[in-house]
Amino acid sequence: MITFSELLLKLQDFWAKQGCTIVQPYDFPSGAGTFHPATFLKSLDSKPWATAYVAPSRRPTDGRYGENPNRLGAYYQFQVLIKPSPDNIQDLYLKSLEALGLDWRKHDIRFVEDNWESPTLGAWGLGWEVWLDGMEVTQFTYFQQVGGFECDPVAVEITYGTERLAMYLQEVESVFDIVWSKNGGHIVTYADVHKRGEFEYSRYNFEVADTKMLFDWFEDASRECKRCLEEKLPLPAYDYCLLASHIFNTLDARKAISVTERQNFILKVRELAKGCAEVYKESLGELSEA
């Protein structure tokens, strides 16, 4: 049986053999692998780029106090970005499943059309959800626009739902029963690693977070992002864009933002992301290509 740790390592090994540069998770909280600079910023220029990485992801509104076997406020995506998109990308994906020990020919694999959008990143793309015996396990996206700019060449993003794949491969009904690792004769489960965190962060995000402080932090992060952009520093600016996005998500979980305000906050983060994209492209001398 493949452990969760082995699953991540096998995906890294497979995509490294396909020519992807393996980078490390980014050290700012974000809601998806797309937010990593290795995807968001690198998809903006015209140079070929292929990368893969584990993406710890936080979505405060999805927390369930560690009581739901299928919903988490923090989890792991595995992200692949290849630009330009290879013609055989679907075949490569199916081979990656084989590398995990899954014979896809014996299962019902479906590519279901599902176009993707990230309002806060000003990004959207055409693509599919990949369903394995009726369960979504992966998202394919051909980026059309990122940070409000057209993508040329078009990059393909593959986002694996690693916990769902692990549950399927290990034949367990709860994410907390996933075997994280086997250390000698000792088994470490997903619950051992993350269940307490799911409870505490759910309580924080839904009940405890200081909303006044977070509103102030959002304004501070936005202001610092813009200041960095004025200094033509898109990478530090993007860090503060990520911070503003995470603070917004926490305020959203805390129900501190009305429906009308929510749209305004999304637009504010989108403008920060667009500013980062614009200054980044400008620094490469590619703004005219947007």
From Swiss-Prot:
Q: What class of enzyme is it?
A: ligase
State any single GO MF term.
ATP binding
Localization, UniProt: Cytoplasm
Any one of the GO BP annotations: glycyl-tRNA aminoacylation
**A GO term from the CC aspect:** cytosol
Partners and quaternary state? Tetramer of two alpha and two beta subunits.
According to the UniProt entry, where is the signal peptide? none
* NCBIfam families, sorted: glyQ, PRK09348.1
List the catalysed reactions: tRNA(Gly) + glycine + ATP = glycyl-tRNA(Gly) + AMP + diphosphate
Reported EC number(s) for this entry are 6.1.1.14
**Alphabetized SUPFAM superfamilies for the sequence:** Class II aaRS and biotin synthetases
Q: Which gene encodes it?
A: glyQ
Does the record bear Cytoplasm in its keywords? yes
Protein name as catalogued: Glycine--tRNA ligase alpha subunit
Q: What family does the entry list?
A: Belongs to the class-II aminoacyl-tRNA synthetase family.
**Family annotation (Pfam families):** tRNA-synt_2e (PF02091)
Organism of this sequence: Nitratiruptor sp. (strain SB155-2)
Q: Which domain of life is it from?
A: Bacteria
